[in-house]
Amino acid sequence: MPRSLKKGPFVDEKLENKIVIARNTKSSHIIKTWSRRSTVTPEMVGLTFAVHNGKKFIPVFVTENMVGHKLGEFSPTRTFYGHAGSKKSKVR
């Protein structure tokens, strides 16, 4: 169930402050964040975030297509190694 429109998108307060500072100084520094639950807003477009996946920080460059999604959607937490093969191919 999506968030109510009257509440508006959630962006962590500390992350919002970092975005304002990055926009005012026009720096190209990567913004480090643990806030995977924050929604991508139009003010974030063009900035690079280092989003924590539980083990390390994954760099995420925000584009217009990402607006409305959560930052955590772009840094996967689980590594997929592929499905198990058949036993016949393993015996040979």
Swiss-Prot record:
Listed GO CC annotations: cytoplasm; small ribosomal subunit
GO terms for MF: rRNA binding; structural constituent of ribosome
The UniProt record lists the keyword RNA-binding: yes
Pfam families from the UniProt entry: Ribosomal_S19 (PF00203)
InterPro entries found in the cross-reference section: Ribosomal_uS19 (IPR002222), Ribosomal_uS19_bac-type (IPR005732), Ribosomal_uS19_CS (IPR020934), Ribosomal_uS19_SF (IPR023575)
GO BP term, example: ribosomal small subunit assembly
Keywords associated with the record: Ribonucleoprotein, Ribosomal protein, RNA-binding, rRNA-binding
Source species, domain of life: Bacteria
Record-stated family: Belongs to the universal ribosomal protein uS19 family.
Role according to the record: Protein S19 forms a complex with S13 that binds strongly to the 16S ribosomal RNA.
Name assigned to this protein: Small ribosomal subunit protein uS19
Protein's organism: Desulfosudis oleivorans (strain DSM 6200 / JCM 39069 / Hxd3) (Desulfococcus oleovorans)
Underlying gene: rpsS
